[in-house]
Amino acid sequence: MKKILSLKKVNLLGPILLALLIAIPLYPKFPFQNVENTYVAIRIEDFLVAACLFVWGLYQLKNGFPVLKLKITKIFLLYWAAGLISVLSAIFISDIINPKLALFHFVRRIEYMSLFFVAYDAMKKLKLREVALAISFTSLLIFLYAMGQRYYSFPVVSTMNEEFSKGQLLILDKWTRISSTFAGHYDLAVWSTLVLSITPIFLVILKRKWERVVILLTMAINFYLLIMTASRVSFVAYLIGITLALLLLKKYLWLPLVLVISIAFGFSSAQLSVRLKTAIDPISSKIASIESWQKIVLFTEQSKDKYFKKPTPTPTTEPDISVIPSQVASDDTTPSIQPGKTTPTPKEGKIIYKDGKGSAWPSPEEAKLAAERSSSIRFDVEWPRAVSAFKRNPLVGSGYSFLGLATDNDYLRSLGEVGILGTLTFLLIHLHLLLTSAKNYLSRNNKNSVISAGLIAGLVSFLANAIFIDVFEASKVAFYFWMIMGILYYYLQTGKTHEKKV
C-alpha cells in the first residue's frame, strides 16, 4: 500500500486529466455492457473515469482528504444527499421507479460531477497552456472526423434511439447534421459552444504567437462545427457566451466584429438560417398561448395512471441515416438497407430531393411545421410530464430515471426528478461558481479576472443550452463541463496559472 500511495511523487493526475480531455470527446459511444430497462449503457469511458477516480482517491487518502476543506465540496455533497433522498423516497415510499435503474442514474450523476475535483487537483502541476493545447488537439481530430463523416462516409455511433445505441455503425447522408464522434449533433453543438466560450481567455493568457494562432484556429474549427450542427439553441448560447467573454475581457472593439461575423455565417448556412427563422414564431406563440399552458395543466391532471406506473423515455428527433449492412442482422422478411439507396424524407431543417435532380431546401410551410413539431414535443409532452413529476412530490421529486431519457429542459428535469430540495442545491453549486468568479473578477489580480471571464462565459453558455437540451445528462459534454469548471476554479482559488504575467 505504501508503494501505491507513493505515486504522489509521480504526479499521475496531470497526465490523466490530459488523457481524459482528449479521450472522452474522441472515443465513440460504443456500449460495453447494456443496462436493463434503458439504452444508457456502461462504456469504456466509464472504466477510464473509474481508474482516474481510483488514482485520485489514493492521493486524497495520502494527504488526509484535503478536498473536504473546499467550500464547494460541501455543496456537492448536499446535492448528492438530496438526490439520494429523492431516490430512496421514490423507491420505498412512492414505489414508482425501478430501484436498480434509479441507483444507476444516481451514480452516473456523481460520476460526471466527480471529475470537477479530479481536474482541480490535477492542475496543481499542469500548466494552462497544456490544457489549451489538449483542447485544440481534440478539436482538430473531431473536426477531421466530422469532415470524413460528411464527405467520406465515416460512421457514427448514435444514441438517438434504442437500436442505434447498441453500437451500430451508421452512415449519415450528406444532408444530415453531423455528429462527429459524439452521440448526436446536439451533443457536438453543446461541446463546441463550451469550447468557444472559454478559448478567448487563452488568447489573453498565452503569449507565444504560434500558441495564439493555434487558439484562433481552434475557435474557427469549433465555430464551423457549430454551424454544421445547425443547432439553434447552441448557436444562441454561443452568442451569449462569446459576448460575455469579450465584455469581461474588455475587448470592446472586437465584440461588434465577432458578433457580425458570427451572425452573418449563421444565416449564410441554409439549414441553420431556416431553423432560426422558423423557430421564432412557433416558440413565441407557444409561450404566449394560454392554450399551451392549459394543456400542461390538463396533462398534469390526466397523467397519473399513464406516466407514474411505468415511465418510458420520449424519443428525440432522429438523424436521417443509413445503416451499414454488415452491422445489421437481416432475414428473408426484412429487406436489407443499402447505403446511398435510402429515400430521403422531409425532416426538421432537412434538404429533400426534387425530381431526382439536385436538391432544394424545404418550403417555408415544411420548415415551419418542423419547428412547430420540435417545440410541440417539448411544450405538449416532455415539459408537462416533468411538471407532473414535480407536482407528485414537490419537495424531493419523483427520483432519477423517472422521466426517461428526454425532457429537453434540465431545470424542469431537475424539479421533476429531485424536487425543490435537489434543484436548489444543484443551482447553489453554479451560484457559488458565479459568485466566486465575480469576486475574483472585481479583484485587482489581472490573472484572476481573465480566468473569471472564462468561467462565467462557459458556465452561462452551458446553462443557456440547458433550457432546451439535457446537457447535464449527456455524458461527453457533462464530463467535459465539470472538468473545465474544476480547472478554472482551481486558478480562482489559488491564483496560479503557471504562465507568464498577463
Functional labels for PLM-detected ranges:
Residues 53, 81-88, 110, 114, ...:
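Alpha-helical transmembrane segments of multi-pass inner-membrane proteins
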Residues 44-50, 78, 96-121, 134:
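Aromatic-anchored transmembrane helix interface
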Residues 179, 184, 382-384, 393-437, ...:
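A conserved mid-to-late transmembrane alpha helix and its immediate loop/hinge
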Residues 41-44, 183-189, 214-246, 250, ...:
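Helix-loop-helix junctions and helix-breaking kinks within/between transmembrane helices
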Residues 1-91, 129, 133, 158, ...:
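Transmembrane signal-anchor hairpin modules in multi-pass inner-membrane enzymes, especially those
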Residues 35, 101, 182, 229-237, ...:
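Membrane-interface catalytic loops of GT-C/OST-like multi-pass glycosylation enzymes that act
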Residues 40-44, 105-109, 179-195, 415-419, ...:
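Membrane-interface micro-motifs in multi-pass membrane enzymes
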Residues 53, 253-257, 454-465, 471-502:
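Transmembrane alpha-helices of multi-pass inner-membrane enzymes
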